[in-house]
Every structure is written in structure tokens, then in C-alpha cells.
Amino acid sequence: MNHDQQIVTRFYMAVDALYALGEIKSFRHFEREIGADHSVFYELRKNERKRTFMHPAWLRHLVVTYSISADWLLVGEGAMFR
């Protein structure tokens, strides 16, 4: 898995963790929050081989809105949450 795929994988790990904690009501609700097309969001979530690109605004939303650590999200260092 290349570096870009690792970032996308951590993005979806964070989304799953936020859903499990009840911070995200549903994946559809989160898709609307970030302005994501359902089919794109779903395909990236389910198909690891297609994880070659992530919208920067989606990453920023996790960092700003949900206190996900940018260090963890981008380079895999430290804890998931700030």
C-alpha cells in the first residue's frame, strides 16, 4: 500500500471510529457534511485498491470538525484524536 492509500485508509478508519462513538449519525449524513458524492465515498470505503486520491477538504473536515490529529491522518504518527 502506497502513502496515498495509507492516508485514505486512515481517513476511513477515523470515520468508522467517529461512527462507533456516535459522533457521526450515519455515513450518508457525513457524506452530506463533506459534500461527497455517495458513490465515490462508498467506492473508496469498500475498495482499497481505488484509494489513490482523497479530497483535501474531506481531510480538513475531520481535523477541524472532529479533532482528528493531522499528524496521525497524514503520516500515521501519534494518536488518532487530538
Please report, for each region that a protein language model flagged, where it lies by residue.
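Residues within the alpha-helical elements of helix-turn-helix
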Residues: 33, 65
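Short, basic-rich loop-to-helix N-cap that marks the start of a DNA-contacting helix
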Residues: 24, 48-64, 80
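Short, charged recognition helix plus adjacent turn
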Residues: 1-2, 74-82
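A short, Lys/Arg-rich alpha-helix, primarily the initiator
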Residues: 1-29
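Hydrophobic/aromatic-rich, well-ordered segments within soluble, folded domains that form packed cores
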Residues: 68-70, 74
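Key DNA-contact positions within bacterial/archaeal DNA-binding proteins
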Residues: 28, 39, 71
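Pre-recognition alpha-helix immediately N-terminal to the DNA-recognition helix
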Residues: 10-13, 40, 58-61
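Recognition helix of helix-turn-helix/homeodomain-like DNA-binding domains
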Residues: 35-54
